Amino acid sequence: MENIAPALLEWFYKNQRILPFRTDPSPYHVWLSEIMLQQTRVSAALPYYERFLAALPDIPALAACEEEKLHKLWEGLGYYSRVRNLQKAARIVCEQYGGQLPADYDALRALPGIGDYTAGAIASISFGLAVPAVDGNVLRVFSRLYNDPGVITEPAVKRAFTARVMEHQPPEKAGDYNQALMELGALVCVPNGAPLCEQCPLASLCEARRAGTALELPHKAAPKARRIEPVTVVLAEDAEERFLLQQRPEKGLLAGLWQPLLWEGEALSAEEVCVRLEALGLACESIEPLPAAKHIFSHIEWRMSGYSVCVGSAEAPAGCVWASREQLQNEYTLPGAFKA
């Protein structure tokens, strides 16, 4: 196959989206954008990106940020382990590299939360290093370009595709080339529907287009079934119209975040909830059921039943706090599961 870079780059320079982390591709900006975009669409992430940078304009500011403020800045993006790793890495960068990301792929790859793709994106876009940055968009483009039925979630297949990506990469324009492939996958060679082949600068080279197999590619491994977990959520309100929050453990799902009272296991009856509240020193003055709901994590599905409970005046149990509506809005970070 002839080299795809000339046609790809010509298309990219004419059609790329104007994004703040492209306008100013400093290492910190590229890093932050890539972490945010791991599980979030560009249009949804941009307001968070701008708000985050306004509050934490550089790596030392990120490293020094208080945990609750950090979580609040991330609130709405989900997958909070991303921002915790972001801060862990920022602290290492301050300790070992003077607050500036290292211009070295392996050093970037060694930082918490930075994998092959993110390290490659920072190294190529911000530092001009000739390294790959292969994400799902790029794998899809190359799966169709070569009409390759390999399962792209398998490590050996990904390595083979990465080698092909590098065969076409112009070393002097590595960052632009990597971004162009991502952009092509995001805008033209799209998933979950018909690719826009008539708009593709690589259409004349695409083997899947010639074979009529573009809609069938790429192949992925079947997803693992999510584990179903019943939980009971209790919105406990006191006489001062404050709500009881408990902090989740420092490790595991939603680590360190705040939530209403929650019990895992089979759905509890109203009587069982009142008994448990009384064991915490809370008198159940009135109780009303809440609509059933569910929340899907990457590997777990919560089936949520719940109650709204008035408990009168009481001290917060150990590990809990009373929070006003204003504090819920401005101080405490609640996961999206509890915002229905």
Predicted ranges, named:
Residues 1-18, 23, 186-340:
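Intrinsically disordered, low-complexity, charged terminal extensions of DNA damage-control enzymes
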Residues 2-198, 202-211, 215, 283:
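Catalytic cores of DNA base-excision repair glycosylases
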